[in-house]
Curated annotation (Swiss-Prot):
Protein name in UniProt: Ribosomal protein uS12 methylthiotransferase RimO
Annotated signal peptide: none
SMART domains listed in its UniProt record: Elp3 (SM00729)
Catalytic activity line of the entry: L-aspartate(89)-[ribosomal protein uS12]-hydrogen + (sulfur carrier)-SH + AH2 + 2 S-adenosyl-L-methionine = 3-methylsulfanyl-L-aspartate(89)-[ribosomal protein uS12]-hydrogen + (sulfur carrier)-H + 5'-deoxyadenosine + L-methionine + A + S-adenosyl-L-homocysteine + 2 H(+)
Classification via Gene3D superfamilies: Methylthiotransferase, N-terminal domain, Nucleic acid-binding proteins, tm_1862 like domain
Protein residues bound to [4Fe-4S] cluster 2: 150, 154, 157
GO CC, alphabetical: cytosol
Residues that hold [4Fe-4S] cluster 1 according to the record: 17, 53, 82
GO biological process: tRNA modification
Domain Radical SAM core, residue spans: 136-373
Function: Catalyzes the methylthiolation of an aspartic acid residue of ribosomal protein uS12.
Organism the protein comes from: Salmonella paratyphi B (strain ATCC BAA-1250 / SPB7)
Boundaries of every TRAM domain copy: 376-441
GO molecular function, one term: aspartic acid methylthiotransferase activity
Length: 441
């Protein structure tokens, strides 16, 4: 008689932003540690977990469709994530969902899984769980989540109502996780949160401990400590607080990547006030100039919203003028979309869709020209590139100026003698508005 027991199998669908990806990885790690197998096909799974996004209406729709697909293909579905905070909305469309939890409800998700698909009593697979946790990103880069929630109340955003106020992770825990990632082969750490520059504010920047040494709970201290790991460290979602100035010298010294992702959202003081965002555009331009003087290699990424309620042609022109003067390297632009529960929904003078579309096109046309000019300046120079993919035609990687998924790529045509995670020196030979082409030096 066989003593082989059935290993319970879980399907997993992860939607949304990198912060959601981190939540998914944490749940997956716990499941694998307990002896569950994670499978890629609905019909192989005993149950499916859908980690949802609910930030904008299109994301809500995508999440609802993913839940529906999981129900049709499998039938046993647990929902978690941001949209899970709106249980009634999910139940109205999908009443057969077994359980619904909100964001970062790891323990609740696991309890529900245990109820419907009991965990195996004996787990001989524990040692198979990678030391750096189960990752949904390639092995050579990883997201490092340093906090949850946000203290800001931007009128276009509902994240605080979904994820709550800022809660910083203990700096010792963050640094220990980073060390485990590096020990497991990670070459690039991407620091993420809802508001990276606010790290430690909620605990009054108290002193924590790592390896027996005192470390202040702050973004600057975190960067100084991460720089000792000898890998690329990239900062995302940095709110433009004054102390952001203090990380620029670390970038100039090569301690962390000269890359700053600062969502500025607009340039009209009036619109920024309606958004409840900081509104001194002249001050921001002066800071950008100062940052570039300290760190000439600095790459600046930002995101903007066009068609926000009340935006006039004059407001929009201020945004275009800001782009021309700031000459940002990487820019994302979104047409304003109402989000259920957001304060901006109640603002007067909603902008017609055709006007949003026209302004978005003008914005993108201008920024593409600026991006192309910025990248053209790199032609003839040598840069470091981290390799992401290799096939028979060559390799694709990213420079220090490129975050995965959202920025450009560096194409190394014909270069096959490398592997993902390698960092190589490349001479840039060509550029367009987004990407670079070059050869290994």
């Amino acid at each position: 008689m066989s003593n082989v027991t059935h290993q319970p199998k879980i399907g997993f669908v992860s939607l949304g932003c990198p912060k959601n990806l981190v939540d998914s990885e944490r749940i997956l790690t716990e499941l694998r540690t307990e002896g569950y197998d994670v499978v890629p096909r609905y019909d192989d799974a005993d149950m499916v977990i859908v980690n949802t996004c609910g930030f904008i209406d299109s994301a809500v729709q995508e999440s609802l469709e993913a839940i529906g697909e999981a129900l049709n293909e499998n039938g046993k579905v647990i929902v978690t994530g941001c949209l899970g905070a709106k249980e009634d909305q999910i139940r109205e469309v999908h009443p057969k969902v077994l359980e619904i939890t909100g964001p970062h409800s790891y323990e609740q998700v696991l309890q529900h899984v245990h109820h419907y698909v009991p965990k195996p009593k004996h787990n001989p697979f524990l040692s198979l769980v990678p030391e750096q946790d189960v990752k949904l990103t390639p092995r050579h880069y990883a997201y490092l989540k340093i906090s949850e929630g946000c203290n800001h109340r931007c009128t276009f955003c509902i994240i605080p109502s979904m994820r709550g106020d800022l809660v910083s992770r203990p700096i010792g825990d963050v640094l220990s996780e980073a060390k485990r990632l590096v020990d497991a082969g990670v070459k690039e750490i991407l620091v993420i949160s809802q508001d990276t520059s606010a790290y430690g504010v909620d605990v009054k920047h108290r002193t924590g401990f790592h390896n027996g040494e005192p470390v202040k709970t702050s973004m600057v201290s975190l960067c100084e400590q991460l720089s000792k790991l000898g890998v690329w460290t990239r900062l995302h979602y940095v709110y433009p607080y004054p102390h952001v100035d203090d990380v620029i010298p670390l970038m100039a010294e090569g301690k962390i990547l000269p890359y700053l992702d600062i969502p500025l959202q607009h340039a009209s003081p009036r619109i920024l006030k309606l958004m409840k965002r900081p509104g001194s555009v002249d001050r921001q331009l002066a800071r950008i100039k100062q940052w570039r003087e300290i760190c000439p290699e600095l790459t600046l990424r930002s995101t903007f919203i066009v068609g926000f309620p009340g935006e006039t042609e004059e407001d929009f022109q201020m945004l275009l003028d800001f782009l021309k003067e700031a000459r940002l390297d990487r820019v994302g632009c979104f047409k304003y979309s109402p989000v259920e529960g957001a304060g901006a929904n109640d603002l007067p003078d909603q902008v017609p869709e055709e006007v949003k579309e026209e302004r978005w096109n003008r914005f993108m046309q201008l920024q593409q020209q600026i991006s192309a000019e910025r990248l053209q300046e790199k032609v003839g120079r040598e840069i470091l590139v981290i390799v992401d993919e290799v096939d028979e035609e060559g390799a694709i990687g990213r420079s220090m100026a490129d975050a995965p998924e959202i920025d450009g790529a560096v194409y190394l045509n014909g270069e096959t003698n490398v592997k993902p995670g390698d960092i190589v020196r490349v001479k840039v030979e060509n550029a367009d508005e987004y990407d670079l082409w070059g050869s290994r030096v």
